[in-house]
Swiss-Prot record:
EC number annotated for this UniProt entry: 2.7.7.27
Listed pathway(s): Glycan biosynthesis; glycogen biosynthesis
InterPro entries in alphabetical order: ADP-Glc_PPase (IPR011831), ADP_Glu_pyroP_CS (IPR005836), GlgC_bac (IPR023049), GlmU/GlgC-like_hexapep (IPR056818), NTP_transferase_dom (IPR005835), Nucleotide-diphossugar_trans (IPR029044), Trimer_LpxA-like_sf (IPR011004)
Binding site for alpha-D-glucose 1-phosphate: 169, 184-185, 201
Record keywords, A-Z: ATP-binding, Carbohydrate metabolism, Glycogen biosynthesis, Glycogen metabolism, Nucleotide-binding, Nucleotidyltransferase, Transferase
Function comment: Involved in the biosynthesis of ADP-glucose, a building block required for the elongation reactions to produce glycogen. Catalyzes the reaction between ATP and alpha-D-glucose 1-phosphate (G1P) to produce pyrophosphate and ADP-Glc.
Catalytic activity: alpha-D-glucose 1-phosphate + ATP + H(+) = ADP-alpha-D-glucose + diphosphate
Family classification: Belongs to the bacterial/plant glucose-1-phosphate adenylyltransferase family.
Subunit structure: Homotetramer.
Name under which the protein is recorded: Glucose-1-phosphate adenylyltransferase
Highest taxon above the source species: Bacteria
Length: 412
């Protein structure tokens, strides 16, 4: 644990991890968005769970839903080790829980399904966070802000330019950052007082426990598809509850450099996902995964180190400007500006450039791959070329984005 305090210890967390992530298809055809690999060895959900753990919050329920099996397996293997001494990271799903056999109809409805876990706790605060974004955050600082303001709900907010704000739910705030109005995807976003930027919701909330229970019980009588953005926040504003915005740019973590402040990625499309991964291999990326004072935790696997083999002209194993995970073998081939997941092998005379290879990919001999994403457990036959002729890529059934990223995934 890297940040401690009674506030974090008096908090339980509910992480919403059931989203389909349809814009990220085909990577989400067999897994939910939080279960998609990121940075080679991680899953997207590892970022929010690491934030909770490093912030001192170790009572965490992960609410899964869509194609939940692989995500639940990952959570058991990566996070189950923290069980005991009143600490837990546990995944629950309508498919596996006797609490409810119905699927969630909205973000707040998901919490309502498991409200008894909150009611039976002695927590003063409940952190409700999404499980499908990439960022670092000390949640205990947001809890402290919530307490100082005697808030009923505090909403994590991105400070974004006006032109970007139209894609988000946007707050109107007073000089104390108390929320006075909220509008989903406004045509004319209202700026923060004294600034030329807007507050956009990150979909992350801190609630005072008693008020959360009350508002969810009230809301479920009115809306079967109860949602925080559409229903709960407007209800609380109408009742004059103390609703505050917490500026994410004010959040500081140990080891953070100034240029890292405010880093947050949605990775909701193939292109944005690809770009966020490729940024990691820059010399000085905005998201520095080598900050050991705030580690991103995951299941390491009992894999041997990565290695390169062969050192002959035309057959020299090389990894250049790349992330290459444990268990990988670059055998007489070249990997350049790429991210290579665990247990992947790139065989002789092949070239992989500007690409993302998931776990256990087998790249045959004399293969050329450029600006592509290769899904887990796929074998690329000898002599295959990917990313050089998009017409041919499409004919083979691969997905090709507008920017030219080729995605090779298993057939449904």
């Amino acid at each position: 644990m890297y940040v401690t305090g009674n506030l974090a210890g008096n908090t339980i967390a509910m992480v919403l991890a059931g989203g389909k992530g349809e814009r990220l298809a085909p990577l989400t055809l067999r897994r939910p968005k939080p279960g998609v690999a990121f940075g080679g060895k991680y899953k997207i959900i590892d970022f929010v769970l690491s934030n909770m753990f490093n912030s001192g919050i170790k009572k965490v329920y992960i609410l899964t839903q869509y194609r939940a099996y692989s995500l639940m397996k990952h959570i058991r293997e990566s996070w189950g080790k923290w069980a005991g001494l009143g600490e837990f990271f546990v995944a629950i799903s309508p498919e596996t829980s006797s609490e409810s056999e119905e699927w969630f109809k909205g973000t707040a409805d998901a919490i309502n399904h498991y409200l008894r876990f909150i009611e039976s706790s002695d927590a003063d605060y409940v952190a409700i966070f999404g499980g499908d974004h990439i960022y670092r955050m000390d949640v205990s600082q947001m809890i402290g802000y919530h307490r100082r303001n005697r808030a009923d709900i505090t909403i994590a907010a991105l400070e974004v330019p006006v032109e970007e704000a139209r894609r988000f739910g946007v707050f109107c705030v007073d000089d104390d950052n108390r929320v006075t109005a909220f509008e989903e995807k406004p045509a004319n976003p209202v700026t923060i007082p004294g600034r030329e930027t807007c507050f956009a919701s990150m979909g992350n909330y801190i609630f005072s426990t008693r008020r959360l229970i009350e508002v969810l019980q009230e809301g479920k009588k009115l809306h079967a598809d109860l949602d925080f953005g559409k229903h709960v926040i407007p209800m609380m504003l109408a009742k004059k509850d103390r609703v505050f915005a917490y500026n994410f740019n004010d959040n500081l973590i140990p080891g953070m450099k100034p240029e890292e402040r405010g880093y947050w990625k949605d990775v909701g499309t193939i292109d944005s996902y690809y770009e966020a991964n490729m940024e990691l291999i820059h010399v000085s990326p905005q998201l520095n995964l080598y900050n050991y004072k705030w580690p991103i935790l995951t299941n390491q696997g009992n894999y041997p180190p990565a290695k390169t083999v062969f050192d002959e002209d035309g057959r020299r194993g090389m990894n250049i400007d790349s992330y290459v995970c444990a268990g990988c073998i670059t055998s007489g081939s070249v990997v350049r500006r790429s991210i290579v997941g665990p247990l992947t092998k790139v065989n002789s005379y092949s070239l992989v450039e500007d690409s993302i290879l998931f776990e256990n990919v087998n790249v045959g001999r004399n293969v050329k791959i450029r600006r592509a994403i290769i899904d887990k457990n796929i074998t690329i036959p000898d002599g295959t070329t990917i990313g050089y002729d998009h017409g041919e890529d499409r004919r083979r059934g691969y997905t090709v984005t507008e920017s030219g990223i080729v995605v090779v995934s298993p057939a449904e």
